[in-house]
Amino acid sequence: MAGKIADVEKVILTASGGPFRDVKDLAEVSLADALNHPTWNMGPVVTINSATLVNKGLEIIEAHYLFDIPYNKIEAVIHPQSVVHSMVEFKDGSTIAQASPPNMKGPIAYAIAHPDRIAQAMPAIDWKSAHAWSFAPIDHERFPAVELAKRCGALGGAVAAMYNAANEVAVAAFMKEEIPFTAIVDTIEKTVTTLGGQAQSVVRDMKDVSAIENDARRVAQEALAKR
C-alpha cells in the first residue's frame, strides 16, 4: 500500500480453504481430518483455525487495525495453492499481489528486518515453471467464520476479542474430541450473541479487554456444556 491508504479500493486476503473446502458434510469430519492441512505445516490450533476459516476472520480484524482499512474494504477469497497471500486493489483498477511459496520464513524475516530485506530468506518462486493459480469466493453458509468476524469487528469495542476468546475455548474442546467440528463457529456466534452488547462498551485499558475475554470464555464453556 506504500502508505497511500487513500488510493486503496480494497484489500483481498487469500485462504487455502483448508482440508474441507470440498467436503460436503462438515459435521462428520474428525480431528485427524482437521489437522491434515493440504499446503501448510502449522501447529494444531492454527491448523484448525485454518479449517474453520477463523484464521482468516482474525486476519481481517488485524488488517483493519494495522492499516486503518474499513471492514467493507477487506475481502477474503479461496486460493487453494497458497502462493498469493494477499492483494491490494487500487482506485485506478490495478492490483498488486504478494506472492511467495507457502512458508512463514519470508514474513518472519521481513518483520525482523523491516524496512530492509534479508537475502535468500526463503526459496523464491520459479517463474520459468508452469503454475496454475485459482481463486474462488468463500461459501459463507458452510464457512460462516469470516463474515462473523467482520460483523464482530464492525460492532467495535472488544467484540473482536470476544470472537477470539470463544474460539479458543471451542477449539480446545474440539481437540479433546468433545464436540463436532461445526460446533466451533456455532459456539463463537452464541457467545457473541449473548455478550455482544456488553463488549461494545468503550474499552479503556487491558483490564477491560481481559474482563470481556473472561466473560466470553465462561459463556462459551456454558454453551458447550448445554450441547
How does the language model describe each region?
Residues 1-227:
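Catalytic, metal-anchored helix/loop core of enzyme active sites in primary metabolism
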